């Protein structure tokens, strides 16, 4: 029922404006120093940079799309405990649960232009590799619990391969092969 509510609510409340995040540069009355200080205070297992891209996304979600942000925060209250339990089972950093916000804006029915589906944005082949059932009636990529389990397994595997959370996260987004290519192109520097 939550999936159906989300689809209808987000369709009805869609922000009238869409943004090309590659070319837009938002302005805010909040000084950069405030954002920088808040990011520094966050306890994280990875380095959190602050740059124009990060600033743009902070402004987008906090100032340009407050309704969507409110919906995402509401969904987080429901789904994050499920993700925490799953990620704890795999002894993963709990902060990785926030990847569902980045991947899909907490939309269990999200579909990317490339064909990735669900909250955790699994491509068909990767979903099958991690045991998600997909046929003409069922697509477990759209199941937040089962896809979170697959995401945790993928992240654990990626961390075992790369030994670095930044690379494991990059691998989740673009695939291990592309991360390996980038490492080779950089002369082994990460």
How would you label these PLM feature ranges?
Residues 57-71, 106-116, 121-167, 182-190:
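Substrate-binding clefts and substrate-entry loops adjacent to catalytic sites
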Residues 89-92, 161:
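Membrane-interface junctions
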Residues 176:
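Active-site-adjacent helix/loop patches that line small-molecule binding or acyl-intermediate pockets
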Residues 92-109, 168-173:
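Short, functionally critical alpha-helical segments immediately adjacent to catalytic or ligand/cofactor-binding
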Residues 1-90:
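An acidic, Gly/Ser/Thr/Pro-rich helix-cap/linker signature
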Residues 74, 81, 85, 97, ...:
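Solvent-exposed, polar/charged alpha-helical surfaces in well-ordered, non-transmembrane soluble domains
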